[in-house]
């Protein structure tokens, strides 16, 4: 299996499929690169090179005790980009992976980046505070960590239902998918799982958003109960000049599965022609409800 080594020696597993302009897929918490199995085949078939890696501590990557802050995670992404010598790449970040996109570009620049996509992303910040009064209270994340400490399998099983809107949004999500999600999540180290809750909940990305100088697509579920849209995508879209903002009005957080019939075509349109080619779908303020 292919691996790259990061600055501190942590080995990251990655998948590398196809040829053409690179698309780097950055998974969300608490999953790994396999979450992209419903997007990767369509991207490869359309002529793109798809690289999907496991974040440190997750999936098949090494599980160190430290390094789960966003500076280190962004440096890990840089190690991958440099080792594979990727240029004109599109960075696609889902959920906490959107934070890596933002921090990578603000920390390392956009010389290797042609465009960016934020899907259900935590940017520009989730935690409630003076600069984010409508954010998520710290107690919510404290309860998540306590649940992980107390009974991680049970917590992850319950979390998976909210993740896909099962039983809440009338989505038909199979028991097999929920079991797969929990199994993938359990591959991660408990240290990484809890440390990343702290990272994605407490990190303020407002200062990173100015780095989005490349064409950017923002996609979010209007019914996302995991990463509420009003404290994330609605704010991010106002901070990224000329971003194309797509809201899947009734979609949950796990829209890479529930709404793949909308997500995949939107990705391909954006990749194929950039933000200009897709701009006819904008409404006032750049926001489109679909």
PLM regions: where:
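Conserved alpha/beta-hydrolase catalytic His-Asp/Glu region
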Residues: 127-136, 147-210
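Catalytic active-site module of serine/aspartate enzymes centered on a nucleophile-bearing elbow/loop
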Residues: 242-290
């Amino acid at each position: 299996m292919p691996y790259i080594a990061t600055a501190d020696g942590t080995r990251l597993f990655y998948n590398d499929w196809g040829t053409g302009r690179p698309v780097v897929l950055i998974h969300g918490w608490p999953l790994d690169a396999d979450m992209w199995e419903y997007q990767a085949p369509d991207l490869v078939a359309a002529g793109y090179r798809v690289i999907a890696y496991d974040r440190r501590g997750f999936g098949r990557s090494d599980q160190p005790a430290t390094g789960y802050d966003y500076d280190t995670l962004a440096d890990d992404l840089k190690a991958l980009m440099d080792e594979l010598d990727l240029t004109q790449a599109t960075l696609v970040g889902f959920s906490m992976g959107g934070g890596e996109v933002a921090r990578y570009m603000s920390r390392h620049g956009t010389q290797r980046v042609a465009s960016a996509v934020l899907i259900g992303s935590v940017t520009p910040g989730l935690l409630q505070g003076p600069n984010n009064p409508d954010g998520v209270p710290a107690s919510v994340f404290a309860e998540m960590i306590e649940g992980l400490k107390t009974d991680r399998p049970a917590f992850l099983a319950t979390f998976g239902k909210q993740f896909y809107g099962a039983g809440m949004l009338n989505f038909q999500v199979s028991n097999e998918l929920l079991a797969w999600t929990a199994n993938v999540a359990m591959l991660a180290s408990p240290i990484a799982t809890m440390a990343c809750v702290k990272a994605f909940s407490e990190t303020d990305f407002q200062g990173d958003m100015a780095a989005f100088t490349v064409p950017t697509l923002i996609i979010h579920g209007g019914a996302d109960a995991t990463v509420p849209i009003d404290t994330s995508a609605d704010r991010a879209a106002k901070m990224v000049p000329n971003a194309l903002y797509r809201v899947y009005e009734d979609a949950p957080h796990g829209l890479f599965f529930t709404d793949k019939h909308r997500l995949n075509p939107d990705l391909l349109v954006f990749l194929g022609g950039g933000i200009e080619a897709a701009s006819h779908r904008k409404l006032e303020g750049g926001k489109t409800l679909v």
